[in-house]
Amino acid sequence: MPELPEVEVVRRGLQDHVVGKTMTAVRVHHPRAVRRHEAGPADLTARLLGARISGTDRRGKYLWLTLDAGAPTTGRDDPDAALVVHLGMSGQMLLGGVPRAEHVRISAVLDDGTVLSFADQRTFGGWQLADLVSVDGSVVPAPVAHLARDPLDPLFDVDSVIKVLRGKHSEVKRRLLDQQVVSGIGNIYADEALWRAKVHGARVAATLTRRQLGAVLDAAADVMREALAKGGTSFDSLYVNVNGQSGYFDRSLDAYGREGEHCRRCGAVMRREKFMNRSSFYCPRCQPRPRR
């Protein structure tokens, strides 16, 4: 699943190419892609038609296009709605040529002739229109309002998150994946952050010191910035940027996917174990497993 860096790469691509453009045609090719839009495909296409894209934004793994959606019918120019995009496991926001037809779920033609396509092989992602609401001093779409800030958010409060984590009597990795504690971190970057901080993901969050938790959160921010600079992490063709290009941070991973390889820090053999229906990768020497 795309995590924060991958979603931010897509957002930046959209920011450069679609802001200021108006949707002149919209077509839903597969109803599952708009299942979160309760009013249905016809309502979504009708409301998007003529809407001007005024900006792009993101929180955690969600991105959205702010729209002057009221302009065609009310004459207002203020952004009052958002097109929320969740990439799910394999969603792609692509510009230009249409990708393989069987995977295109939604397409929109912009007033300069650009085609914006949402392709999704596994159909877990989708689009929905939502009202914008004010939460913690930020304006976000209503479906995103429950998410915590992410480590790359300028208003991310490390001390507050540490306080929340120290009150949790469950594994620290479980809490890092909790999008209501800190958003944007998924399995890959959780493992990378824990490896950098020399903390095993099975450690109970409440038993870690403030310094240890701060090191984990700082590492998460650092590794995601590095991944962002390299276009994100791509293990297959399911994650690409708006031009259909893969990221290459997978070559720089220190923990995730490295079972049986030597730890780049101490030389021990990296291990994998099951965790929350996922796999966790760690160094048994740098990140000793807690005693039960």
Swiss-Prot record:
DNA binds at H103, R122, K168. SMART domains: Fapy_DNA_glyco (SM00898), H2TH (SM01232). Its cofactor is Zn(2+). Keywords: DNA damage, DNA repair, DNA-binding, Glycosidase, Hydrolase, Lyase, Metal-binding, Multifunctional enzyme, Zinc, Zinc-finger. Its EC number is 3.2.2.23, 4.2.99.18. It catalyses: Hydrolysis of DNA containing ring-opened 7-methylguanine residues, releasing 2,6-diamino-4-hydroxy-5-(N-methyl)formamidopyrimidine; 2'-deoxyribonucleotide-(2'-deoxyribose 5'-phosphate)-2'-deoxyribonucleotide-DNA = a 3'-end 2'-deoxyribonucleotide-(2,3-dehydro-2,3-deoxyribose 5'-phosphate)-DNA + a 5'-end 5'-phospho-2'-deoxyribonucleoside-DNA + H(+). The active site is at P2, E3, K61, R278. One of its GO terms (molecular function) is 8-oxo-7,8-dihydroguanine DNA N-glycosylase activity. Pfam families: Fapy_DNA_glyco, H2TH, zf-FPG_IleRS. Gene3D superfamilies: 1.10.8.50, MutM-like, N-terminal (3.20.190.10). It comes from the Bacteria. A zinc finger (FPG-type) spans 254-288. InterPro entries: DNA_glyclase/AP_lyase_DNA-bd, DNA_glyclase_Znf_dom_DNA_BS, Formamido-pyr_DNA_Glyclase, FPG_cat, MutM-like_N-ter, Ribosomal_uS13-like_H2TH, Znf_DNA_glyclase/AP_lyase, Znf_FPG/IleRS. GO terms for biological process: base-excision repair. Binds 1 zinc ion per subunit. PANTHER family: FORMAMIDOPYRIMIDINE-DNA GLYCOSYLASE. Involved in base excision repair of DNA damaged by oxidation or by mutagenic agents. Acts as a DNA glycosylase that recognizes and removes damaged bases. Has a preference for oxidized purines, such as 7,8-dihydro-8-oxoguanine (8-oxoG). Has AP (apurinic/apyrimidinic) lyase activity and introduces nicks in the DNA strand. Cleaves the DNA backbone by beta-delta elimination to generate a single-strand break at the site of the removed base with both 3'- and 5'-phosphates. Monomer. Belongs to the FPG family. This is Formamidopyrimidine-DNA glycosylase. The lineage of its organism: Bacteria, Bacillati, Actinomycetota, Actinomycetes, Mycobacteriales.
